[in-house]
Swiss-Prot record:
Record's function text: ATPase required for the post-translational delivery of tail-anchored (TA) proteins to the endoplasmic reticulum. Recognizes and selectively binds the transmembrane domain of TA proteins in the cytosol. This complex then targets to the endoplasmic reticulum by membrane-bound receptors, where the tail-anchored protein is released for insertion. This process is regulated by ATP binding and hydrolysis. ATP binding drives the homodimer towards the closed dimer state, facilitating recognition of newly synthesized TA membrane proteins. ATP hydrolysis is required for insertion.
Record key words, sorted: ATP-binding, Cytoplasm, Endoplasmic reticulum, Hydrolase, Metal-binding, Nucleotide-binding, Transport, Zinc
Protein name: ATPase ASNA1 homolog
Binding, Zn(2+): C275, C278
Active site residues per record: D58
Subunit structure: Homodimer.
Any one GO BP annotation for this protein: tail-anchored membrane protein insertion into ER membrane
Locations listed in the record: Cytoplasm; Endoplasmic reticulum
Binding, ATP: K29, G30, G31, V32, G33, K34, T35, T36, E236, N263
Amino acid sequence: MVDNLEPLPASLQNLVEQDSLKWIFVGGKGGVGKTTCSSSLAVQLAKVRESVLIISTDPAHNISDAFDQKFTKVPTKVNGFDNLFAMEIDPNAGLNELPEEYFEGENEALRVSKGVMQEMINALPGIDEAMSYAEVMKLVKGMNFSVVVFDTAPTGHTLRLIAFPQVVEKGLGKLLRLKMKVAPLLTQFASMLGMADVNVDTLSQKLDDMLRVITQVNEQFKNPDQTTFVCVCIAEFFSLYETERLIQELTKCGIDVHNIIVNQLLFLNNSHSACKMCASRYKIQEKYLDQIADLYEDFHVTKLPLLEKEVRGPDSIKAFSENLMTPYDPKAKPKE
């Protein structure tokens, strides 16, 4: 009976048309074209959403190369778009590595308090980078983007990023529970350094606000109406193996995943004889495409071509992004 089911549409149209989505993660094994796919998805979303943000969490920060434009840790408008923004963050960075834009509007007392608290945070392993992540998410949430696309690092780092909201929630909760014990020590420490304006209550309120944002993000990440994950792979054994492992881990974490992109595929033209290597690669890819069809019959599987030229710059990404919406046709003439 299952064999009679129609395969799901081979595109990302289902994601682009799902207005409730707030967070879309794009990830997979290194070297499969995640950045090209995430950038292309962001471009398509920008056509139908009011404002779109793409965030690179990969230390390699390839979205600057993809759009041929330098991005920073603060959302920057992408050239050629009115409603598409990009930023690059290091999820392993600490609070002191965040730019001043993250702390605009805070009084000097809170800035001093943050510096003192930083010393204490350093004594709690993992809390520093967790709070840095919390600051980033608070900034992103405050800007009210319609949807946020994450261009993630290779699989291991991605799973850690997905779990970060839970880590932050626990870490901030621990800090707040220690508040009564920390407050006198913080005041005394500040006094010894001649910092009379340290306001523990203000800093505590900031932690409360941060915890509230992260708790909300954590809930949204596990809501399939608001969050989903797109797996990118190529038709080879190791990539397929990594994809299956990623899907299993995402399922354990309660993260929705029902889209797979198979990138860098050969589409042989029957009117021309293929070289021996191309014919061999084509057979290998066909074998793994059959396996993908069997394993993921309830997934949207989008097939993207291996191109002669690299996809770089806004115009190239715009053209390539059409393949996410309409299955690639090797006979169709490329758009100029």
